Protein backbone atom coordinates (compact mmCIF):
# COMPACT_ATOMS: atom_id res chain seq x y z
CA UNK A 1 0.00 0.00 0.00
CA UNK A 2 1.32 3.46 -0.95
CA UNK A 3 1.66 5.74 2.10
CA UNK A 4 3.49 8.67 0.50
CA UNK A 5 3.32 9.86 -3.10
CA UNK A 6 5.09 12.89 -4.49
CA UNK A 7 6.60 13.65 -7.91
CA UNK A 8 10.10 13.03 -6.49
CA UNK A 9 9.47 9.95 -4.28
CA UNK A 10 6.96 7.37 -3.11
CA UNK A 11 6.85 5.06 -0.11
CA UNK A 12 5.12 1.71 -0.16
CA UNK A 13 4.57 -0.56 2.84
CA UNK A 14 4.00 -4.29 2.55
CA UNK A 15 2.91 -4.79 6.13
CA UNK A 16 2.59 -8.59 5.94
CA UNK A 17 6.29 -8.74 4.97
CA UNK A 18 7.42 -5.93 7.29
CA UNK A 19 8.83 -4.26 4.18
CA UNK A 20 9.21 -0.59 3.23
CA UNK A 21 10.11 0.49 -0.30
CA UNK A 22 11.29 4.07 -0.77
CA UNK A 23 11.33 4.77 -4.51
CA UNK A 24 12.93 7.91 -5.89
CA UNK A 25 11.66 9.53 -9.10
CA UNK A 26 14.41 11.75 -10.48
CA UNK A 27 15.91 14.72 -8.65
CA UNK A 28 14.81 15.77 -5.17
CA UNK A 29 15.87 19.12 -3.73
CA UNK A 30 17.02 19.28 -0.10
CA UNK A 31 13.57 19.85 1.36
CA UNK A 32 12.06 17.03 -0.71
CA UNK A 33 14.91 14.62 0.00
CA UNK A 34 14.72 15.15 3.73
CA UNK A 35 10.92 15.05 3.78
CA UNK A 36 10.86 11.63 2.07
CA UNK A 37 13.67 10.23 4.23
CA UNK A 38 11.98 11.44 7.42
CA UNK A 39 8.59 10.12 6.31
CA UNK A 40 10.16 6.70 5.66
CA UNK A 41 11.65 6.74 9.17
CA UNK A 42 8.28 7.63 10.67
CA UNK A 43 6.46 4.90 8.73
CA UNK A 44 9.15 2.39 9.71
CA UNK A 45 8.50 3.14 13.37
CA UNK A 46 4.74 3.05 12.92
CA UNK A 47 4.71 -0.31 11.09
CA UNK A 48 7.72 -1.92 12.83
CA UNK A 49 9.54 -2.39 9.53
CA UNK A 50 12.33 -5.00 9.39
CA UNK A 51 13.33 -4.77 5.72
CA UNK A 52 14.02 -1.49 3.92
CA UNK A 53 14.48 -1.13 0.17
CA UNK A 54 15.93 2.10 -1.21
CA UNK A 55 14.98 2.09 -4.88
CA UNK A 56 17.34 4.66 -6.37
CA UNK A 57 17.14 3.39 -9.96
CA UNK A 58 15.80 6.73 -11.29
CA UNK A 59 17.28 9.01 -8.63
CA UNK A 60 19.66 11.76 -9.68
CA UNK A 61 22.50 13.45 -7.76
CA UNK A 62 22.33 13.97 -4.00
CA UNK A 63 23.67 17.35 -2.89
CA UNK A 64 26.67 17.36 -0.55
CA UNK A 65 24.66 19.03 2.24
CA UNK A 66 22.10 16.23 1.99
CA UNK A 67 24.81 13.59 2.02
CA UNK A 68 26.17 15.12 5.24
CA UNK A 69 22.65 15.31 6.69
CA UNK A 70 22.09 11.64 5.83
CA UNK A 71 25.21 10.54 7.68
CA UNK A 72 24.92 12.89 10.68
CA UNK A 73 21.16 13.28 11.21
CA UNK A 74 19.30 10.51 9.37
CA UNK A 75 21.61 7.56 10.09
CA UNK A 76 21.30 7.64 13.92
CA UNK A 77 17.51 7.52 13.57
CA UNK A 78 17.74 4.72 11.01
CA UNK A 79 20.02 2.72 13.33
CA UNK A 80 17.44 3.04 16.13
CA UNK A 81 14.87 1.19 14.00
CA UNK A 82 14.44 -2.58 14.05
CA UNK A 83 15.82 -2.96 10.50
CA UNK A 84 17.27 -6.40 9.77
CA UNK A 85 18.04 -5.97 6.05
CA UNK A 86 18.64 -3.00 3.75
CA UNK A 87 18.52 -3.46 -0.01
CA UNK A 88 19.70 -0.67 -2.29
CA UNK A 89 18.77 -0.61 -5.96
CA UNK A 90 21.59 1.17 -7.73
CA UNK A 91 20.84 4.35 -9.68
CA UNK A 92 21.50 4.61 -13.39
CA UNK A 93 22.89 8.10 -12.68
CA UNK A 94 26.67 8.29 -12.28
CA UNK A 95 26.46 11.28 -9.90
CA UNK A 96 24.04 9.42 -7.64
CA UNK A 97 26.35 6.40 -7.67
CA UNK A 98 29.26 8.57 -6.56
CA UNK A 99 27.18 10.17 -3.79
CA UNK A 100 25.95 6.80 -2.54
CA UNK A 101 29.45 5.35 -2.57
CA UNK A 102 30.68 8.25 -0.46
CA UNK A 103 27.75 8.08 1.99
CA UNK A 104 27.87 4.30 2.37
CA UNK A 105 31.59 4.47 3.05
CA UNK A 106 30.76 6.65 6.07
CA UNK A 107 27.66 4.68 7.10
CA UNK A 108 28.86 1.10 6.71
CA UNK A 109 31.02 0.98 9.88
CA UNK A 110 27.91 1.81 11.94
CA UNK A 111 25.52 -0.65 10.31
CA UNK A 112 24.69 -3.82 12.22
CA UNK A 113 22.54 -5.49 9.57
CA UNK A 114 23.21 -6.76 6.03
CA UNK A 115 23.21 -4.27 3.16
CA UNK A 116 23.09 -5.56 -0.41
CA UNK A 117 23.03 -3.82 -3.79
CA UNK A 118 20.75 -4.80 -6.66
CA UNK A 119 19.91 -3.80 -10.22
CA UNK A 120 16.13 -4.32 -9.98
CA UNK A 121 13.27 -4.32 -7.50
CA UNK A 122 12.23 -7.97 -7.88
CA UNK A 123 15.67 -9.29 -7.00
CA UNK A 124 15.92 -6.88 -4.07
CA UNK A 125 12.50 -7.94 -2.77
CA UNK A 126 13.35 -11.63 -3.07
CA UNK A 127 16.50 -11.09 -1.01
CA UNK A 128 14.74 -8.90 1.58
CA UNK A 129 11.91 -11.39 2.06
CA UNK A 130 14.21 -14.38 2.70
CA UNK A 131 14.69 -15.21 6.36
State the predicted function of each range.
Residues 1-131:
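Amphipathic, Lys/Arg-enriched alpha-helical "gate/interface" segment within cytosolic domains
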Amino acid sequence: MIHFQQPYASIEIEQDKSLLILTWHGFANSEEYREAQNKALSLSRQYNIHCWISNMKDMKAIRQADQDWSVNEWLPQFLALNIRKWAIIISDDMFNQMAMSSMMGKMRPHLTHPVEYFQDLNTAKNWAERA
